[in-house]
Amino acid sequence: MEETYGYPYFLIHRGDLHKVLLDRAYEVGTDIKVNSYVSDVDETGPSVTLTNGLKFTADLVIGADGIISQASPLARNTNRFLIGIKSRIRKSVILDRDVKIIPDPNCAYRTLIPGELMANDPDLKALIDNPAANCWIGPEGHIMAYPIRNGALYNFVMCHPGSVPVGQPNERASLDDLIERYKSWDSIICKLISLVPQCLKWQNAEIEKLETWISKSGKVVLIGDASHAMVPYMAQGAAMAVEDAVAIAECLGRVTDTEQIPELMSHFQKIRLQRCYLILDGARNNGNIWHLPDGLAQQQRDKKMAQQTKPQEAESSQGNPNKWSDPKFQPWMFGHDARAEAKSYLYNVYPTTEAAKKFNADITVNTSALIV
């Protein structure tokens, strides 16, 4: 990976990634207000009003509250998570209807196994000692697993049919049911499940493709899962949000007057929308391919995937059914430079002038900085 794309494939706890981003936000002076529940968004201002009555005005509101939203007092008072179609911020962009949320047939069964529990079994110890993402695929399911925190924990995620209300957290899965489900798979899997302290069940889902991520005023914009939530079968959901952030930063870097923000948000959407929705489709399709039941289609899939491990046969094959490893799709996905793409696009339609450089040295666009 590093030889091909210039960077390694990092295996990281999502909470640790959040901490890295949070620390950097504080370093550059961001004012972050946690436990802030949004009661109203005025997209014309724009402004955001919290349930405690505080109101914040800004030049731009960036909605990054994901497929789930705690932006309503109902979410706080009843301890029930509201799905993203109830998001106050998204409702300021899509005014006339609720956005459809599309549950996947599968749930993700997530757990973290202490690395020390795996150390006494040679088969399991090898998974910790040799950092790599391991994937098992089979009938109506797959498993993705890898070590994190220098082997202190082993992230273990099983995906197979199940149902739970979208956005409901902390529903526990039966470990006995998991062992029964995977007893005919690789014996290592049941060994791992036997070490699981607890397993939480999460409904995989995506939202419908939106025609716009921008409010009518151009002063509220959606990024990340709020605009393109996808199923996890390409492991690209967080990556797309980071790419969004890079692209929107490049757009805001061209601002010489706040009146330009709506136009630049339109350019941001043009830069990002097609790629995000191609990844969204690719993730769904990859899940369908991984989860094929035993039969002819599965046998053909396995044959084509095996060909990709043999250089001579790979050259004559028509690609890998596993898009993660496909010789055409993988470079397009992993080799993408979001900053370079944004700069190239903006250079042609919105070049940075000397005046803009001087202006940007003296002014910062006021964006909302709320974690909801």
Question: Where on the chain are the PLM-derived regions?
Answer:
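Active-site acidic short loop of glycosyltransferases
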Residues: 43, 57-58, 194, 198, ...
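Conserved mid-domain beta->alpha element of the FAD-binding
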Residues: 62-63, 80-81, 109, 145, ...
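Short, flexible helix/strand-to-coil boundary loops that buttress conserved ligand/catalytic motifs
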Residues: 75-76, 92-93, 193, 234, ...
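Conserved N-terminal helical subregion
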Residues: 1-115, 165-178, 326-328, 333-372
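Amphipathic alpha-helical interaction motifs in eukaryotic regulatory proteins
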Residues: 22, 26, 39, 72, ...
